[in-house]
């Protein structure tokens, strides 16, 4: 089965999620879709996890713990969140293959490099095999491709990264990986009475959105 994986290099959860892909059932084809998280957040009117103080601290501590548990190298970059638009453009410029995306994630979260530094960004470009980084960053076709892939994800219902898209189903977050595996092995198990009931559960109360200082 072909599935899709929406990602942004800003997400440490996406880095950890990428490391789980070898556990996918045999025969699963994955297309990696560059998706600008900030654009997704703006579309849905959401805050990112790093924009809520206590959640930010928990998130960073959790990913450090989880990386240790998984046995994968992990180092947060010097600042987070950070502007990763240019790094995402470099990934989009060379096609977003699994090898390319894993190389970029290893650079950011395996080594903890600061891709907002122009010299470090140029180094990432070299690692990805881009001969002219500035040309790639300013290529209208690259910019349009990244906009289009982000919009594609939004149209499929993506509200966060990483997200797997399998048919009409979304599996958000690296911690939904086992749920995805179960779905790929037995899709009918996700169409029983309990699942259908929660799909149509009525809303009991809504609240006004409050902007906090």
Residues of each region from the PLM?
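C-terminal cap of thioredoxin/glutaredoxin-like
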Residues: 2, 10-28, 105-213
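Structural alpha/beta surface segment adjacent to cysteine/selenocysteine redox centers
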Residues: 13-111, 194-213
């Amino acid at each position: 089965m072909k599935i899709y994986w929406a990602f942004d290099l800003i997400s440490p959860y996406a880095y950890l999620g990428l490391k789980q892909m070898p556990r996918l059932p045999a025969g699963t084809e994955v297309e990696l879709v560059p998706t600008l998280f900030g654009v997704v957040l703006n579309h849905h009117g959401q805050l990112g996890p790093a924009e809520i103080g206590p959640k930010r601290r928990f998130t960073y501590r959790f990913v450090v713990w989880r990386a240790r548990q998984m046995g994968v190298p992990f180092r947060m970059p010097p600042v987070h969140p950070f502007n990763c638009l240019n790094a995402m453009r470099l990934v989009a410029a060379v096609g977003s293959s699994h090898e390319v995306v894993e190389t970029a994630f290893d650079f950011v979260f395996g080594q903890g490099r600061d891709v907002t530094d122009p010299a470090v960004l140029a180094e990432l470009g070299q690692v990805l095999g881009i001969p002219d980084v500035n040309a790639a960053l300013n290529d209208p076709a690259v910019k349009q491709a990244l906009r289009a892939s982000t919009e594609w994800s939004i149209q499929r219902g993506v509200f966060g990264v990483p997200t797997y898209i399998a048919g009409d189903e979304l599996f958000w977050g690296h911690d939904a990986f086992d749920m995805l595996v179960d779905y790929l092995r037995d899709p009918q198990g996700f169409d029983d009475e309990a699942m259908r009931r929660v799909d149509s559960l009525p809303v009991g109360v809504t609240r006004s959105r409050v902007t906090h200082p």
